[in-house]
Amino acid sequence: MDTHIWVWSLLEPGRLSRRVSKALADPANEVWTSPISVWEILVLRQKGRLILQPDAMAWVSAALLRVPLKEATLTHEVAMATAQVALRHQDPADRFLAASAKVYGLTLVTSDRNLLAGKGFSVLANR
């Protein structure tokens, strides 16, 4: 799932569509996250764009334990796949999330228009 979807699912679940909420809650679905999302959360906190209590590291550690998540490990294959996903912009975090979805055969849950318009990986729109 995209970083903002993970954060919203924990802090602002009302921002998720019914379809996305249902998909995330369905025990038949595996929910995956990427280390890139952890990095992105920490960067957003450093820039003051995200407030986390008691602090960012503690929040991320607790968030990783709160719901069962599988880790989409960053591998050489994922790094190479960043060149195979078609995105309108060059945001490295988005490229790694899209490439992870491609390599692991996952559906990337997002509200990001750039990712929704991308090609080479599966998406579920939060609408």
Which residues make up each language-model segment?
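Short, well-structured N-terminal submotif of metal-dependent ribonuclease cores
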Residues: 1-33, 47-62, 66, 104, ...
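Generic structural signal for small/hydrophobic residues in well-ordered secondary structure
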Residues: 3-4, 41, 82, 101
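Hydrophobic side chains within alpha-helical segments
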Residues: 5-7, 43, 94-98
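Short glycine/serine/threonine-enriched helix-capping/active-site loop
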Residues: 33-34, 74
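Short, conserved active-site loops that position catalytic residues or coordinate cofactors/metal ions
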Residues: 35-40
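Active-site neighborhoods of divalent-metal-dependent phosphate/nucleic-acid chemistry enzymes
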Residues: 51-58, 65-113
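Basic, glycine-rich
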Residues: 123-125
